[in-house]
């Protein structure tokens, strides 16, 4: 399967939203299992709505470049990047691959493309934030395989 990475276009929004919601469903299931039920419901009353809005916002933002992975005319994944030019840090801000095509190198290809783009934009460090829950384990393996190193961070929540 030949995959091309090209700039996101507005007509691809529905496909990007659809694949991202499918890709992130196991992640939110995992988060729900790890968090106190009341806290989870407070933070994510309807994660699909909030994630849809987040993807729409990222795809519309002029300062957030987005690329899509295309094969056989279908959008199979996307990556969004944010730059912080003061410390020269580029961030893999969003990444998702159609679940049926995960594990085939599409996510890695999107990340490598984004890293090359960041280098060309003058960034000297790349970062990505991801969850420590089981649902994010495949993402963590991919980032580590591509040379990212983890900085452990603990985040605690309590229902008030």
Go through each PLM region and give its residues.
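Extreme N-terminal starter segment of soluble prokaryotic enzymes
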Residues: 2-4
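Active-site acidic-Proline motif in GNAT/NAT acetyltransferases
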Residues: 83, 98-104, 135
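Helix-turn-helix-type domain boundary/helix-start signal
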Residues: 6-7, 104
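Conserved beta-strand-loop-alpha-helix junction that forms the acyl-donor binding cleft
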Residues: 102, 127-139, 157-160
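Acetyl-CoA-dependent GNAT
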Residues: 7-93, 98, 111-112, 117, ...
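Conserved residues at the C-terminal ends of beta-strands
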Residues: 82, 129, 154
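Conserved acetyl-CoA-binding loop-helix of GNAT-fold acetyltransferases
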Residues: 97, 103-116, 141, 145
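Conserved active-site alpha-helix within GNAT-family acetyltransferase domains
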Residues: 108, 120, 124, 132-152
């Amino acid at each position: 399967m030949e995959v091309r990475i090209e700039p996101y276009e507005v007509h691809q929004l529905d496909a990007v939203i659809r694949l991202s919601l499918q890709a992130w469903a196991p992640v939110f299931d995992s988060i729900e299992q790890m968090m106190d039920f009341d806290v989870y419901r407070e933070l994510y009353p309807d994660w699909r709505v909030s994630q849809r809005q987040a993807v729409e916002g990222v795809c519309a933002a002029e300062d957030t470049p987005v690329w899509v992975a295309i094969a056989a005319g279908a959008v199979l994944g996307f990556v969004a990047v944010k730059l912080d030019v003061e410390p020269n840090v580029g961030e893999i801000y969003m990444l998702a691959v159609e679940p049926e095509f995960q594990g085939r190198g599409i996510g890695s290809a999107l990340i490598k493309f984004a890293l090359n783009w960041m280098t060309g934009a003058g960034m000297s460090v790349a970062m990505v934030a991801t969850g420590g829950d089981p649902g994010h384990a495949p993402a963590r393996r991919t980032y580590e395989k591509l040379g990212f190193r983890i900085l452990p961070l603990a985040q605690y929540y309590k229902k008030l």
